[in-house]
């Protein structure tokens, strides 16, 4: 074999090798998260020993509504279209979501749709197969995998572009929403109204809240993709975790959620003690601010459990379920209501509560 032949063969083999993924660090995010955690822990120290009880309670309240901004707002409403909201509710959720300081709604919702559509692949921004830390927050410390950006372009975001609340927040997020609503006002209110030291208020009501809200939310991406049962689809990584459900206000029923992402409850049972967000949305529906709340019929749930579940979910009456096969493949993933790959049969089994005309 000639040297030219060897060179040609080596060139062909190298061309066939998949392009290696190299980390490119995002130092801005790394520095930001170091500062966030250091100041958050300092805020915890102040909350325990120096802050007024009113400041501590107020900070806890801000944490609760910030989580609602994420769960009811950027997640169930804008990412998954699991229900529809009148303008007053969309404005309220926009303010709540800003308090989470998890970037603007548009960024949150668009990348979350990519996460669902391509869950736990290289196209998933926080692919849990790359480890607990990566899926928790490490994904923010490096540039996204090329597949993330490529697949991002295949998802429809036209509904977000048509939402004036989303686009106004996106336009003014870094100049008004984050600095004023997210950072300054939460600290200024305790200082102005009950004489709390401003810096104590800042570290407790702003930085501790920011740190806690971020880590609680991120546990859904990490913990709830690794630990727990898979009663609805054993072929995917997301799991059921009651602990995460309580911490996040209902986002821990993650195997169910990835199986039926358009359900406004993000869980089969929707008990308020482990799904605070469902209670919030039911109240909003009662006063007319939320409508067209989508959920899944019991028959559809049973069929899916028997077909792809891990056997941990039991039913009292399964004899009415007919022609159920055991599939051992990864079901086509959906990002939520409106995904073009959603089967007509699935749409027929969806229940819509509080249906109203736009």
UniProtKB/Swiss-Prot annotation:
Motif (Histidine box-2): 112-116
Enzyme Commission number, as recorded: 1.14.19.6
Catalytic activity: (9Z)-octadecenoyl-CoA + 2 Fe(II)-[cytochrome b5] + O2 + 2 H(+) = (9Z,12Z)-octadecadienoyl-CoA + 2 Fe(III)-[cytochrome b5] + 2 H2O; (9Z)-hexadecenoyl-CoA + 2 Fe(II)-[cytochrome b5] + O2 + 2 H(+) = (9Z,12Z)-hexadecadienoyl-CoA + 2 Fe(III)-[cytochrome b5] + 2 H2O
UniProt entry keywords in alphabetical sequence: Fatty acid biosynthesis, Fatty acid metabolism, Iron, Lipid biosynthesis, Lipid metabolism, Membrane, Metal-binding, Oxidoreductase, Transmembrane, Transmembrane helix
Cell compartments where the protein resides: Membrane
Binding-site residues, Fe cation 2: 115, 225, 254, 258
Cofactor comment: Expected to bind 2 Fe(2+) ions per subunit.
Annotated binding of Fe cation 1, by residue: 75, 80, 112, 116, 257
Transmembrane intervals: 30-50, 55-75, 175-195, 200-220
Span of the annotated motif Histidine box-1: 75-80
GO CC, one annotated term: endoplasmic reticulum membrane
Coiled coil: none
Primary location: membrane
Cited function: Catalyzes the formation of a Delta12 double bond, acting on monounsaturated fatty acyl substrates like palmitoleoyl-CoA ((9Z)-hexadecenoyl-CoA) and oleoyl-CoA ((9Z)-octadecenoyl-CoA) with higher desaturation activity on (9Z)-octadecenoyl-CoA than (9Z)-hexadecenoyl-CoA. Requires preexisting cis double bond at the Delta9 position of fatty acyls to be able to insert the Delta12 double bond.
Family according to the record: Belongs to the fatty acid desaturase type 1 family.
Protein name: Acyl-CoA Delta-12 desaturase
Organism: Tribolium castaneum
